[in-house]
């Protein structure tokens, strides 16, 4: 599985050199033909390599032109999709109709569209003008349904996802409209969605460890065992999956779309934490994929004390790099057994759903990686 970030305003762009005019419901919309062709090539290459492709659609807060009709402006980086105006709503319909046509066929199939980033934290990641949660989710649910209808009209295999972070019952700004708890956001969103006709949403969840810096998620003190837990991390991810199964239904799927583990306490611990988290996701039938957030960490991560990458800022491979390469192979459990001493387990089969035979039908690794040493 591969998750890509795509900028809406780079695709819907009348200032490009090679324009493609798309007519939708009597209006014309201008797309960047070269950009779209490049994205199609990118998707096709991943598909040819055997990967499913998922795309996060992001709208910059300073988007201009036709894309700007969908933007609220303000916030830090990204805007939520503005469907409260006729122009914004119609533009979003046109955009998703176009994207479904371009990326709904077998050669260029986007298997999932993730709308925005961490929508429960609108000020930081999905600004919507400081609205109440109810008004915000009215808008977001409308955008979600438009995307759902557009993609499903072309491909029954494509899904749409809401993006959420780990603040399950934690309201960061204490009742303001800049941040909302994940659970209230999910509940309100699903209520709004059902009110206009039931469809099955999917969730792109970010399962970082508590505080982001400390890698050992099994020690997360705020991650409890019940639905009243403050946060949900890999320690208690089953709280999320069980809640979604009961609230939305067993057909809803959860993608762990972004998480990474710090290497500041040693590369062996980082590798062990990743293997542990991956196996938890593998053993949970409601989790469809686990996406590691960083290949090579950027300077902005390092500046905050986040040394998350499979490779460091200079491109040097950390121990987690080889763990990542073998994690879903036939030899997975054997190649990672030396990492157990860095966890609170004595065997990976202590994880629910993991058996010695779990990976027996998977591909065998081509390169014979030695067991990771301490």
Provide a role label for each language-model segment:
Residues 37-48, 97, 101, 145, ...:
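Surface-exposed alpha-helical segments enriched in charged/polar residues
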Residues 44, 92-93, 111, 135-268:
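Noncatalytic carbohydrate-binding groove/subsite architecture in carbohydrate-active enzymes
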Residues 1-172, 210-211, 297-302:
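Substrate-binding cleft and catalytic face of glycoside hydrolase catalytic domains
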Residues 1-3, 114, 204, 255, ...:
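Residues embedded in well-ordered beta-strands within globular domains across many folds
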Residues 52-54, 159, 253-254, 288-291:
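Beta-sheet entry/capping signal
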Residues 30-32, 85, 132, 178-182, ...:
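Helix N-terminus capping/helix-initiation residues
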Residues 13, 17-22, 71-74, 81, ...:
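Aromatic-rich peripheral "rim/lid" segments of glycoside hydrolase catalytic domains that contact
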Residues 64-82, 170-187, 264-278:
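Short, electropositive alpha-helical surface patch
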């Amino acid at each position: 599985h591969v998750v890509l970030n795509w900028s809406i305003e780079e695709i819907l762009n009348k200032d490009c050199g090679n324009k493609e005019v798309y007519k939708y419901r009597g209006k014309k919309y201008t797309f960047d033909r070269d950009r779209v062709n490049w994205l199609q090539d990118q998707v096709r290459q991943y598909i040819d390599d055997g990967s499913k492709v998922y795309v996060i659609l992001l709208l910059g807060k300073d988007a201009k032109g036709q894309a700007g009709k969908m933007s609220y402006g303000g916030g830090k980086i990204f805007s939520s999709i503005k469907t409260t105006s006729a122009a914004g709503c119609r533009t979003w319909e046109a955009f998703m109709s176009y994207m479904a046509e371009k990326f709904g066929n077998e050669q260029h199939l986007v298997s999932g569209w993730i709308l925005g980033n961490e929508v429960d934290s609108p000020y930081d990641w999905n600004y919507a003008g400081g609205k109440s949660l109810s008004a915000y989710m009215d808008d977001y649910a409308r955008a979600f349904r438009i995307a759902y209808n557009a993609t499903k009209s072309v491909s029954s295999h494509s899904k749409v996802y809401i993006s959420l972070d780990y603040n399950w019952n934690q309201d960061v700004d204490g009742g303001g409209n800049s941040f909302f708890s994940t659970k209230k956001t999910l509940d309100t969103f699903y209520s709004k969605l059902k009110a206009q006709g039931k469809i099955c949403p999917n969730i792109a969840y970010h399962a970082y460890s508590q505080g982001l810096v400390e890698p050992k998620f099994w020690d997360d003190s705020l991650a409890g065992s019940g639905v009243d837990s403050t946060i949900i991390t890999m320690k208690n991810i089953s709280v999320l999956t069980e809640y979604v199964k009961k609230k939305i239904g067993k057909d809803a799927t959860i993608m762990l779309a972004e998480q990474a583990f710090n290497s500041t306490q040693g590369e062996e611990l980082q590798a062990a934490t990743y293997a542990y988290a991956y196996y938890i996701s593998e053993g949970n039938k409601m989790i469809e994929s686990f996406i590691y957030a960083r290949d090579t960490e950027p300077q902005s991560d390092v500046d905050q004390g986040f040394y998350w990458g499979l490779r460091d800022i200079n491109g040097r491979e950390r121990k987690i790099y080889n763990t990542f390469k073998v994690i879903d192979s036939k030899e997975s459990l054997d190649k990672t057994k030396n990492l157990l001493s860095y966890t609170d387990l004595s065997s990976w089969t202590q994880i629910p759903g993991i058996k010695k035979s779990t990976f027996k039908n998977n591909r065998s690794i081509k390169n014979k990686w030695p067991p990771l040493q301490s």
